[in-house]
Amino acid sequence: MRTICYKTVNGINLLGDFYSASNTNSPVIVYIHGGGFIFGSRKEILQEQVKQYNQAGFHVFSIDYRLAPETKLSAIIEDVRDALRWVCDQAPSMLDIEPSAIAVIGSSAGGYLALLAGSKESYVKAVVSFYGYGDIRGEWASEPSPFYLQKTIVPKKLADQLITKEILTESSIQQRFGLYLYYRQQGSWIRETTGLDPIQNKEELRLLCPIECVDHSSPLLCSYMGKQIMMFPVKNLYVWRNG
């Protein structure tokens, strides 16, 4: 495994871990971790997952990105797009990859980022989302969540203590899940992570929804969702299948 800086912003290095397949000039999977945009790390990819991808002939590049609410969602999306551009433009000479064969895979928030960032890049050949969000405009995202309200209520004072003055590029679920839980319980998750008001900034939010951005020019898209996912509705993903 090799750790590489794919981008520097405001003096902060954004890193990715590169896991090489045995064959040179192999296709590459860019893996994007989840965490509600608030926590997570490139290191969270399962080693068994990496092993299976490598054995199937794929290099793997698992990336960090800046985290919310210290960084807003539009900048997070730009980080992911910059990682994809780096893989296409810079990585071939360094890592023996095939730049014409790039796939993007992510889970949960990472699945959302994979769908949104990967669907508009011509050099991306496939996007795979595991329970990623297709639409962040609904009440499920901008109103208090019945699912998360069943859990211990997080006080505002505790949530405020979890916000830093620094840019974060990785954080464990133990460190920051309380902040995510607070936002979901208060119905402020979208407002805090995007900096947009769900009522007043509908057009800006529309542009942050994968179901509004995917078209016939997009690469092959696969979105997997469990039948018992309770945190957000599955039905908005059916638009792709039926559209």
Feature annotation, model-predicted:
Residues M1-T24, I77:
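N-terminal cap/lid segment of alpha/beta-hydrolase-fold proteins
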Residues S217, C222-M225:
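Short beta-strand/loop motif that positions the catalytic acidic residue
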Residues F130-E212:
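Accessory cap/linker subdomain of secreted extracellular hydrolases
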Residues M230-V239:
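Conserved alpha/beta-hydrolase "acid-adjacent" motif
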Residues D82-K157, K202-L205:
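Primarily recognizes the serine-hydrolase "nucleophile elbow" in alpha/beta-hydrolase
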Residues C5-T8, S41-Q49, F61-A103:
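Catalytic nucleophile-loop/oxyanion-hole region of alpha/beta-hydrolase
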Residues V28, N54-F61:
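A fold-wide structural signal in alpha/beta-hydrolase
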Residues S22-Q52:
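Short, surface-exposed "cap/lid" segments of acyl-processing enzymes
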